[in-house]
């Protein structure tokens, strides 16, 4: 039995050609998932000449199989980052994540994408005593870098639970509707897009 992400239901995939000839551009963006198409969009909006390449078809990779959450919370991460890179660098990382979250929501608003964007809390929880201690360390790491998180006493659904931390002002959305919306804007901006085009190497050559 094959399983398909719910995001792909009722969405008609794009059909872009593969790249078969040489071309010249200022920037090549490799990969047409959320990161790639958003990067191409932001560059094109700044007037940069961009080409977007995808080795498969758009939406078939990580983006098509995502959990669809927009959050700066990525598992038990910040305590580890502080241990390895210090408070200041971890703060910078968290700041970049917050800016990315804001940027995506701003794009959705500016382009009027109906991609079911919804503000929500992000919850990290466990039903294991040892992991509950790790959650306490993660919460302490949050507070060291100015992230406003808190312990929650219960979950909004009935599953085994010992401890959890929550972040407010996070979000969720339909990732492929967002992706398709950005791609349509890129088409309007005349950005060349190629599917089934594998980038195999990057060669540094002297500039003429």
Residue locations for each model-derived region?
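Short, hinge-like loop/turn segments at secondary-structure boundaries
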Residues: 67-72, 168-169
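Helical element adjacent to the flavin cofactor pocket in flavoenzyme catalytic cores
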Residues: 133, 140-145, 165-208
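Dinucleotide-binding Rossmann-like beta1-alpha1 core, especially the glycine-rich loop
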Residues: 73-152
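Extreme N-terminal leader/targeting segments of oxidoreductases
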Residues: 1-27, 45
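N-terminal Rossmann-like FAD-binding beta1-loop-alpha1 element of flavoenzymes
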Residues: 22-52
């Amino acid at each position: 039995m094959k399983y398909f992400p719910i995001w792909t239901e009722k969405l008609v995939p794009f059909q872009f050609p593969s790249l078969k000839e040489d071309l010249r551009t200022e920037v090549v963006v490799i990969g047409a998932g959320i990161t790639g198409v958003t990067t191409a969009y932001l560059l094109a909006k700044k007037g940069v000449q961009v080409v977007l390449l995808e080795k498969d078809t758009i939406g078939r990779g990580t983006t098509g199989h995502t959990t669809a959450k927009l959050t700066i919370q990525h598992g038990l991460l910040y305590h580890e980052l502080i241990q390895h890179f210090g408070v200041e660098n971890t703060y910078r990382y968290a700041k970049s994540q917050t800016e990315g979250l804001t940027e995506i929501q701003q794009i959705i608003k500016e382009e009027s994408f109906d991609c079911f964007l919804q503000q929500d809390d992000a919850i990290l929880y466990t039903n294991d005593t040892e992991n509950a201690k790790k959650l306490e360390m993660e919460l302490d790491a949050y507070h060291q870098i100015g992230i406003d998180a808190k312990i929650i006493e219960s979950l909004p659904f009935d599953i085994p639970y010992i401890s959890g931390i929550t972040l407010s002002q996070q979000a969720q959305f339909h990732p492929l509707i967002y992706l398709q919306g950005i791609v349509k804007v890129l088409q309007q901006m005349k950005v060349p897009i190629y599917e089934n085009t594998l980038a195999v190497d990057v060669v540094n050559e002297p500039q003429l």
